[in-house]
């Protein structure tokens, strides 16, 4: 995830692969934490092999051929969820090999965040990652120790784990270890700050922004939250704003989804039809 993903091809490919990951992790018995660890391992494998990156991003090879190569190489070595995610990544189009590595790392973080969500640690994960990033940034000695590439990766990972022992969730420790041991050209504190944004995005997806013409009662908010939770398959928190201009009805936004049932919108649509 070091560096920005290409805004065009890479962004679309990442989004498609994340859908595959989400579906895989929704399966009964799927281990999101282990899947994240496996995807981090694949990221390291891609980073260490220019030939592998080129093979999986070669536009002259079909997506099916690249998918078969991934299955032949990694089947049985990583979780089924990680395997299908890497297959989706390899089958997609990429502008550069680095984009593939960045996307794989991003989805590794998403998998760990998913595990934190399931464990009820999502809020703690965001806070703990942020605080640890600030601790590292504020300590030149610690910052230099975690940036020392002459030290073995395992030693830097162990240092991060010791600092968080008994003070943080397992998912925080997992991500801190990875950030500390990463050799991807970005300091640990900067990686952690990027990953805080991934957690924040996941938390944002769990919030329904509701605009109503009049205030909702507590009972109405609870019913709305329950309905949305059933629809999205996860707990939804309702944030309510009041806008009398809506006249009646609700406008609900959850992530990129917008459900507009306001009377003002219906009236506007009716006017457009009449004018057309």
Swiss-Prot record:
It comes from the Bacteria. GO terms for molecular function: proton-transporting ATP synthase activity, rotational mechanism. GO terms for cellular component: plasma membrane; proton-transporting ATP synthase complex. InterPro entries: ATPase_OSCP/dsu (IPR000711). It holds the Pfam family OSCP. The keyword Endoplasmic reticulum does not apply. Keywords: ATP synthesis, Cell membrane, CF(1), Hydrogen ion transport, Ion transport, Membrane, Transport. The keyword Ion transport applies. Its main location: membrane. NCBIfam families: ATP_synt_delta, PRK13430.1. F-type ATPases have 2 components, F(1) - the catalytic core - and F(0) - the membrane proton channel. F(1) has five subunits: alpha(3), beta(3), gamma(1), delta(1), epsilon(1). F(0) has three main subunits: a(1), b(2) and c(10-14). The alpha and beta chains form an alternating ring which encloses part of the gamma chain. F(1) is attached to F(0) by a central stalk formed by the gamma and epsilon chains, while a peripheral stalk is formed by the delta and b chains. Belongs to the ATPase delta chain family. This is ATP synthase subunit delta. It comes from Kineococcus radiotolerans (strain ATCC BAA-149 / DSM 14245 / SRS30216).
